[in-house]
């Protein structure tokens, strides 16, 4: 079965082909980062309009890369939510229009389920059950995943997501949008011994996290350094970035290990854009190796939003496919409301 997947929940337009026998056939992606940089963040109206401009050319490019035509498709999957309403409507409209014209079914996909399942696009792929660390700009959660649609929340951030904290702290330090990846790169040249920042909720009995206070801690540190030394230079900025990243990484690693211990599981899956962070990967790899835990990541190119994860999730939910026509979007959508799937593709 060949599934075409559309992702348009925020500021990436993604299209992909997934074959239930062969795996990922092709994928195409356009990011709007440069367009939104002028405004210092995502502008929903501009995001929606850019999805409209990009989605058909990307679909054509994806089909050409895979050597397929529309007539080869068996189903179409699209991100139904959560996300920006206008952006979601673009993917939903195109998916349903194509499916209606081709007389093939559509599959509504939860964006976060796409992220949770995305490491299955790697080789080797994880087997169920596993603990998942979902860490992105909008979400930071630890979940026990027993199968498709079988998700138990073990812990989550009580305020800012880790990726959101990266972006906000980067802006505070004068880095251009999108600042999170720039902060991570700058941290690599920072001195880990120069500054220390708090590790919020590191030793709490639960598996919840909190990152909003780190921004205040960074601002306090920056203000103190500027009072003592004047405007911060590039090395000092890198040292502050390193201290910030060390704090986030230590919390994520300790909470992940706590989730593994609580569940007794021996597989950890890391998904979401922050999952591409090299220091986080290195720390998780080392900690899991000491405990004989397998750790899995999506390919680096598929850590951020993409159509491949939506096509995969759609393929694994083929039994929920339905006729095209009337459709809805869900800008807010609780992952726990998804039905379980038995015998997924």
UniProtKB/Swiss-Prot annotation:
Pfam families: TsaD (PF00814)
CDD domains per UniProt: ASKHA_NBD_TsaD_bac
EC code: 2.3.1.234
InterPro entries (alphabetical): ATPase_NBD, Gcp-like_dom, KAE1/TsaD, TsaD
Binding site for substrate: 134-138, 167, 180, 277
Superkingdom to which the source organism belongs: Bacteria
Localization of this protein: Cytoplasm
Gene Ontology molecular function, alphabetical: iron ion binding; N(6)-L-threonylcarbamoyladenine synthase activity
Top class in the EC scheme: transferase
Binding site for Fe cation: 111, 115, 305
Alphabetized UniProt keyword annotations: Acyltransferase, Cytoplasm, Iron, Metal-binding, Transferase, tRNA processing
Cofactor binding note of this UniProt entry: Binds 1 Fe(2+) ion per subunit.
Keyword Oxidoreductase: no
Cofactor requirements of the protein: Fe(2+)
Catalytic activity line of the entry: L-threonylcarbamoyladenylate + adenosine(37) in tRNA = N(6)-L-threonylcarbamoyladenosine(37) in tRNA + AMP + H(+)
SUPFAM superfamilies: Actin-like ATPase domain
Gene Ontology cellular component annotations, sorted alphabetically: cytoplasm
Any single biological process term in GO: tRNA threonylcarbamoyladenosine modification
Function of the protein: Required for the formation of a threonylcarbamoyl group on adenosine at position 37 (t(6)A37) in tRNAs that read codons beginning with adenine. Is involved in the transfer of the threonylcarbamoyl moiety of threonylcarbamoyl-AMP (TC-AMP) to the N6 group of A37, together with TsaE and TsaB. TsaD likely plays a direct catalytic role in this reaction.
HAMAP family: TsaD
Family label: Belongs to the KAE1 / TsaD family.
Name this polypeptide is given: tRNA N6-adenosine threonylcarbamoyltransferase
């Amino acid at each position: 079965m060949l599934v075409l997947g559309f992702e348009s929940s925020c500021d990436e337009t993604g299209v992909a082909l997934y074959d239930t026998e062969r795996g990922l056939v092709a994928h195409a992606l356009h990011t709007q980062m440069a367009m939104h940089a002028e405004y210092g963040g995502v502008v929903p109206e501009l995001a929606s309009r850019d999805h409209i401009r990009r989605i058909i050319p990307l679909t054509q490019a994806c089909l050409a890369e895979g050597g397929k035509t529309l007539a080869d498709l068996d189903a179409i999957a699209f991100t139904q939510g959560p996300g920006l309403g206008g952006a979601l409507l673009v993917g939903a409209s195109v998916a349903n229009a194509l499916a209606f014209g081709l007389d093939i079914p559509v599959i509504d996909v939860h964006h976060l389920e796409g992220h949770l399942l995305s490491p299955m696009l790697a080789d080797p792929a994880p087997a169920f059950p596993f603990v998942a660390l979902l860490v992105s700009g909008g979400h930071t959660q630890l979940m026990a995943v027993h199968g498709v649609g079988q998700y138990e929340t073990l812990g989550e951030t009580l305020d800012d997501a880790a990726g959101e904290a990266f972006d906000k702290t980067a802006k505070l330090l004068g880095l251009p949008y999108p600042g999170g990846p720039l902060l991570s790169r700058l941290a690599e040249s920072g001195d880990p011994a120069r500054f220390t920042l708090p590790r919020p909720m590191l030793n709490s009995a639960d598996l919840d996290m909190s990152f909003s206070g780190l921004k205040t801690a960074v601002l306090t540190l920056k203000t103190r350094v500027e009072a003592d030394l004047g405007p911060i230079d590039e090395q000092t900025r890198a040292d502050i970035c390193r201290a910030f990243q060390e704090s986030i990484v230590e919390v994520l690693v300790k909470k992940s290990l706590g989730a593994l211990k609580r569940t007794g599981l021996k597989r950890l899956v890391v998904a979401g854009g922050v999952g591409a962070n090299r220091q986080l990967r290195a720390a998780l790899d080392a900690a899991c190796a000491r405990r004989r835990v397998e750790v899995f990541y999506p390919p680096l190119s598929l850590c951020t939003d993409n159509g491949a994860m939506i096509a995969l999730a759609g393929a694994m939910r083929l039994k929920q496919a339905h006729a095209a026509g009337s459709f809805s979007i869900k800008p807010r959508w609780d992952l726990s409301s998804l039905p379980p799937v038995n015998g997924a593709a």
